[in-house]
C-alpha cells in the first residue's frame, strides 16, 4: 500500500487522539503519529486528497508532505 506523510499541527495527546479518531472512522488505513515532530505517516489505498480532507476534519492545520 502507498504511504503518505502529512504535517498536522498537533500540540498534545488530545490532538493526536483526534487524528486517530478521524482516520479510524475512515477505515482502510494504517498510520503512525509522530507527535513531537507533528507528522502523521499513513499507509492506505485512499488518495492523498481523501486523506487530507479526512485530517482536515480535526480542525488542525494540515499539509501534505508527499509520498514516503
Curated annotation (Swiss-Prot):
Disulfide bonds: none
Keywords attached to this entry: Acetylation, Chaperone, Copper, Copper transport, Ion transport, Metal-binding, Phosphoprotein, Transport
GO biological process, one term: negative regulation of apoptotic process
Residues involved in Cu cation binding: 12, 15
HMA domain sequence ranges: 1-63
InterPro entries linked to this entry: Copper_transport_ATOX1-like, Heavy-metal-associated_CS, HMA_dom, HMA_dom_sf
Matches recorded under Gene3D superfamilies: 3.30.70.100
GO cellular component: cytosol
Phosphoserine PTM positions: 47
GO MF entry, a single one: copper chaperone activity
Entry-linked Pfam families: HMA
Keyword NAD listed: no
N6-acetyllysine sites (modified residues): 60
Family stated for the protein in its record: Belongs to the ATX1 family.
Stated role: Binds and deliver cytosolic copper to the copper ATPase proteins. May be important in cellular antioxidant defense.
Domain notes: The heavy-metal-associated domain (HMA) coordinates a Cu(+) ion via the cysteine residues within the CXXC motif. The transfer of Cu(+) ion from ATOX1 to ATP7A involves the formation of a three-coordinate Cu(+)-bridged heterodimer where the metal is shared between the two metal binding sites of ATOX1 and ATP7A. The Cu(+) ion appears to switch between two coordination modes, forming two links with one protein and one with the other. Cisplatin, a chemotherapeutic drug, can bind the CXXC motif and hinder the release of Cu(+) ion.
PANTHER family registered for this protein in UniProt: COPPER TRANSPORT PROTEIN ATOX1 (PTHR46365:SF1)
Subunit structure of this chain's protein: Homodimer. Interacts with ATP7B. Interacts with ATP7A. Interacts (via dimer form) with SLC31A1 (via C-terminal domain); this interaction improves ATOX1 stability and controls intracellular Cu(I) levels.
Protein name stated in the entry: Copper transport protein ATOX1
Organism (species): Rattus norvegicus (Rat)
Gene (UniProt): Atox1
Amino acid at each position: 500500500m502507498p504511504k503518505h506523510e502529512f504535517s498536522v499541527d498537533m500540540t498534545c495527546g488530545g490532538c493526536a487522539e483526534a487524528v486517530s479518531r478521524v482516520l479510524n472512522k475512515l477505515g482502510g488505513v494504517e498510520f503512525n503519529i509522530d507527535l513531537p515532530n507533528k507528522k502523521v505517516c499513513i499507509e492506505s489505498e485512499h488518495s492523498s486528497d481523501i486523506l487530507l480532507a479526512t485530517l482536515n476534519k480535526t480542525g488542525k492545520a494540515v499539509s501534505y508532505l508527499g509520498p514516503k
